[in-house]
């Protein structure tokens, strides 16, 4: 689907991510620039943008460059923000209003021209509020022709932290956790419950889909399956965005992470990536 106007395509977790406040601060900043959310796949970027648009604007329009190739032609041909907005309004069937409509560009790494166009929104149409998001943006950010240097705000989005995890999985316990004052003694019953919740967090992690599954089913096997699928998605992305030359070494580095973290020595060991491995073999892949 090319766009969506109001409804969320799927509910990840009915809870407030801390990053929502960062988005509110961005909206209220008089020197606001188009905002680019950076982060790995499935950390909740799309959910955040739509939730923000739904609750803090009169309307939002959503465009996904990964789902509709024809959308890219608008940015390949046009550089004028007003013309782009006219065409986007025709596509979504809604008038895009300055300050009242949040414009969302998702998977923007699939259209470097759209990423570059953000500088024209900053220069010529900054009254329009634009948020873009993408995964593996590093390769584009390293290319000055694709990246609008100094013309966008950047915000890194990460998996849910323990506070967000607790808020989603046990609101009552979170209320207690949030009320704890510095150096306050924690009652044993709550200490044990918080410790159990933290142990669950270490196993489940902070990926929103995993947390949502845990909230709905409390089934470790379901969570483990989702985790395996996410790892597979990441591994497939390596070859998609970095080319065949580097993808093999990137994959080797990625698969060595658990072994690296398990070592008592905190220094990264290239030999754990591949027997006889040297820095010059994997430095580029790590970067």
Give the location of each predicted region.
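Interdomain hinge/linker elements that couple catalytic modules in large macromolecular machines
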Residues: 2-11, 167-287
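Structural recognition of the conserved hydrophobic beta-strand(s) that form the central parallel beta-sheet
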Residues: 104, 129-135, 156
């Amino acid at each position: 689907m090319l766009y969506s106007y109001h409804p969320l395509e799927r509910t990840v977790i009915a809870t407030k991510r801390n990053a929502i406040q960062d988005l509110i601060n961005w909206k209220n900043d008089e020197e606001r620039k188009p905002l680019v959310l950076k982060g790995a796949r499935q950390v909740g970027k799309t959910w955040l943008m739509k939730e923000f648009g739904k609750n803090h604007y009169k309307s939002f329009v959503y465009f996904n460059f990964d789902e509709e190739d024809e959308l890219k032609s608008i940015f390949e041909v046009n550089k004028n923000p007003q013309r782009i907005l006219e065409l986007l309004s025709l596509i979504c069937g809604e008038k895009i209003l300055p300050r009242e409509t949040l414009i969302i560009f998702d998977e923007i790494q699939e259209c470097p021209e759209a990423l570059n166009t953000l500088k024209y929104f900053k220069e010529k149409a900054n009254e329009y509020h634009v948020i873009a998001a993408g995964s593996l943006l590093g390769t584009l950010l390293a290319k000055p022709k694709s990246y609008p240097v100094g013309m966008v705000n950047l915000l890194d989005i990460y998996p849910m932290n323990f506070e967000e995890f607790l808020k989603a999985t046990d609101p009552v316990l979170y209320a207690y956790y949030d009320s704890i004052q510095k150096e306050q003694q924690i009652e044993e019953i709550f200490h044990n419950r918080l410790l159990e919740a933290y142990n669950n967090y270490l196993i489940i992690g902070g990926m929103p889909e995993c947390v949502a599954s845990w909230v709905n089913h409390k089934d470790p096997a379901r969570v483990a399956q989702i985790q395996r699928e996410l790892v597979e998605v990441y591994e497939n992305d390596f070859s998609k965005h970095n080319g065949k030359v580097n993808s093999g070494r990137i994959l080797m580095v990625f698969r060595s992470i658990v072994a690296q973290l398990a070592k008592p020595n905190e220094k990264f060991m290239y030999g754990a990536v591949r027997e006889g491995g040297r820095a010059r073999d994997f430095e580029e892949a790590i970067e």
